[in-house]
C-alpha cells in the first residue's frame, strides 16, 4: 500500500508540475502578446508625433494602421485602437487636403479678380465648399473624440474590463493636452476664409468703383479705397495667425 501511495503522490506532484508549467507558459505567452500590442501602439504614436498634420508620413501611417500583428485577445484590442486612429486621422487628412488643394489664398490676386470678378461666382462656390468641409471635419472630430464614442470602440471588442486600461492608454494619445489642438489649428483658416469672403462681397458691392490695373486694384474714390483697406487689414490679421 505504501508503494501505491508513493505512486499516487508522485503522480499528483507531476500533475502539479505540469499545471504550474502550463500556467507560467500561459503567463509568458500573454506577456509576449501584450508587449506586441504595446509595440504597435508605440509605433503608431511615433508615426503621428509631428507638429503639423502635413508632416505625417501617410504611407508609413497607412502601412501600420492597416496591419494586424497581434494574437489572441490582443488582436481585438489592436483592431479597436487602429480603427479608432484611422477614423481620427482620416478626418484630419480630409481637412488638410481640402485646405492645401484649394486656391482660396489666390482669390484676391489680379488674375482672379479679372477672371472671376466682379461677381466671383466660382470663387464663392469654392469658398462655400471649403468652409463646409472644414466645419464638417470639426463636427466629426468632436463627435469621435467624445468619451462615449471612444468607449464604444472598446465595447465592440467584447473584452473584459481587464483590457480597458490598455485601450484607454492607447487612445488617450489622441486626446489629453492636445485634445483641442486640431480644432484650434482650423480656427485661423476659418477666419481667413471668412475674411476673403467678406472682401469678395465688398468688391461685388462696389463693382463699379474699382478696376485692375496691372498688378494693382484701383478704386475711383478714396472712401471705397479706405474701406477696402480695412477689409484687407482684417484678412492680414486672420492670416497672420496661421
Say what each PLM segment does.
Residues 43-53, 66, 70, 82, ...:
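Generic surface-pattern signal
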Amino acid at each position: 500500500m505504501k508503494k501505491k501511495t508513493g505512486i499516487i503522490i508522485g503522480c499528483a506532484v507531476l500533475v502539479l508540475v505540469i499545471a504550474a508549467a502550463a500556467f507560467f507558459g500561459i503567463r509568458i505567452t500573454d506577456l509576449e502578446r501584450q508587449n506586441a500590442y504595446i509595440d504597435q501602439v508605440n509605433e503608431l504614436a511615433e508615426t503621428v508625433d509631428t507638429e503639423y498634420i502635413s508632416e505625417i508620413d501617410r504611407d508609413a501611417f497607412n502601412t501600420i494602421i492597416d496591419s494586424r500583428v497581434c494574437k489572441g485577445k490582443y488582436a481585438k484590442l489592436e483592431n479597436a485602437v487602429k480603427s479608432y486612429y484611422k477614423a481620427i486621422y482620416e478626418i484630419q487628412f480630409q481637412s488638410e487636403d481640402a485646405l492645401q488643394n484649394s486656391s482660396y489664398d489666390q482669390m484676391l490676386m489680379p488674375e482672379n479678380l479679372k477672371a472671376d470678378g466682379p461677381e466671383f461666382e466660382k470663387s464663392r462656390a469654392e469658398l462655400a465648399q471649403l468652409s463646409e468641409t472644414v466645419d464638417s471635419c470639426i463636427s466629426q472630430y468632436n463627435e469621435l473624440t467624445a468619451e462615449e464614442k471612444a468607449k464604444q470602440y472598446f465595447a465592440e471588442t467584447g473584452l473584459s474590463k481587464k483590457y480597458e486600461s490598455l485601450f484607454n492608454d492607447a487612445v488617450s494619445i489622441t486626446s489629453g493636452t492636445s485634445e483641442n489642438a486640431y480644432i484650434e489649428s482650423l480656427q485661423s483658416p476659418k477666419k481667413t476664409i471668412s475674411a476673403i469672403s467678406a472682401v469678395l462681397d465688398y468688391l461685388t458691392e462696389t463693382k463699379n468703383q474699382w478696376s485692375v490695373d496691372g498688378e494693382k486694384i484701383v478704386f475711383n474714390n478714396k472712401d471705397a479705397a479706405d474701406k477696402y483697406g480695412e477689409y484687407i487689414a482684417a484678412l492680414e490679421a486672420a492670416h497672420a495667425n496661421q
